[in-house]
């Protein structure tokens, strides 16, 4: 299930550099995190939904790649983002 348009707009406004900045690394990671958190609730109820689990693993992998890229390019933005999102690193 995807996020609503309002939820995406709020994430873009919170993490983007401008109002229409939907492509920056921070926004992409924040959107993926929101979708991952939504799917985790889905899997607590639907344990055998392996098709969606594959999509979840793909999103987690994509988020990891984006975070690695951001860490390589700008460590300050990386640490700020993981602190704001509450990720472990």
Swiss-Prot record:
Offer one Pfam family short name for this entry. Answer: Ribosomal_S15
Superkingdom, natural source = Bacteria
Q: Which InterPro entries match?
A: Ribosomal_uS15, Ribosomal_uS15_bac-type, uS15_NS1_RNA-bd_sf
Q: Which residues form a coiled coil?
A: none
Biological process GO annotation list? translation
Q: Choose one Gene Ontology CC annotation of this protein and give it.
A: cytosolic small ribosomal subunit
Gene Ontology MF, one: structural constituent of ribosome
CDD domains in alphabetical order? Ribosomal_S15p_S13e
SUPFAM superfamilies linked? S15/NS1 RNA-binding domain (SSF47060)
Which keywords does UniProt give here?
A: Ribonucleoprotein, Ribosomal protein, RNA-binding, rRNA-binding
The family database entries (NCBIfam families) matched by this protein are listed as:
S15_bact (TIGR00952)
UniProt-listed HAMAP family: Ribosomal_uS15_B
Quaternary structure annotation from Swiss-Prot or TrEMBL: Part of the 30S ribosomal subunit. Forms a bridge to the 50S subunit in the 70S ribosome, contacting the 23S rRNA.
Its biological purpose? One of the primary rRNA binding proteins, it binds directly to 16S rRNA where it helps nucleate assembly of the platform of the 30S subunit by binding and bridging several RNA helices of the 16S rRNA. Forms an intersubunit bridge (bridge B4) with the 23S rRNA of the 50S subunit in the ribosome.
The UniProt entry's sequence similarity note says: Belongs to the universal ribosomal protein uS15 family.
What name does the UniProt record give this protein?
A: Small ribosomal subunit protein uS15
